[in-house]
């Protein structure tokens, strides 16, 4: 290990970091030409929000309830459970919305397809009242982890992607569990 140092702080270039970046770009099948390493998930989420705001010129970020995005100042604001309460008001511009949860549906759905349809309609309604032209990003966990392993019903993530694309909103997938 001493002969070939591993990754260090992200701002230091190392052969191991370069090789990891090359493998990530290769695995992405030509859809990436740059990799941005961070020290951890919360920092990655904070940087993703910064990039989305700079890229779109917009300020708001939509995040789901029943989510955990980290314990740093910005990431805890994105978190959609009671852990964020002692840290409020947190960073400005964060709006929470309900995602799908077929087991205890906030949308009173009777099937997974109905849950998907109603959750996507709720997201679209939230965007309408917030003003889609003010929203930089939607961040969510594709598989919710710390609030139970909550796998979204079929079609939900593709529907979120479609809504984001329609309005020029960055879709941030904070993935840890899948």
State each model region's role.
Residues 108-110, 148-153:
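Short, solvent-exposed loop/turn segments at secondary-structure boundaries
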Residues 22-137:
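PLP-dependent aspartate aminotransferase-fold enzymes
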Residues 1-18:
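A glycine-/small-polar-enriched, mobile loop at the entrance of the PLP active site in fold-type I
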Residues 144-146:
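Alpha-helical transmembrane segments of integral membrane proteins
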Residues 120, 150-178:
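Catalytic PLP-binding core of fold-type I/II PLP enzymes
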Residues 11-15, 113-121, 151:
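Conserved phosphate-coordination/catalytic loops
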């Amino acid at each position: 290990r001493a002969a070939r140092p591993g990754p260090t702080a992200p701002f230091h270039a190392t052969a191991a970091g370069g090789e990891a970046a090359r493998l990530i770009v290769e695995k992405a099948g030509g859809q990436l030409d740059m990799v941005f390493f961070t020290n951890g998930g919360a920092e990655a989420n904070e940087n993703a929000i910064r990039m989305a705001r700079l890229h779109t010129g917009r300020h708001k970020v939509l995040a789901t309830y029943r989510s955990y995005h980290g314990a740093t100042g910005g990431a805890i604001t994105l978190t959609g459970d009671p852990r964020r309460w002692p840290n409020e008001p947190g960073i400005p511009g964060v709006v929470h919305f309900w995602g799908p949860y077929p087991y205890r549906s906030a949308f009173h759905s009777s099937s997974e397809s109905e849950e998907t349809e109603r959750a996507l309609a709720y997201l679209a309604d939230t965007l309408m009242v917030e003003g889609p032209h003010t929203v930089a990003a939607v961040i969510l966990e594709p598989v919710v982890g710390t609030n139970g392993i909550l796998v979204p019903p079929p079609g939900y993530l593709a529907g979120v992607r479609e809504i984001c694309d329609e309005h020029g909103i960055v879709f941030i997938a904070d993935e840890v569990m899948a």
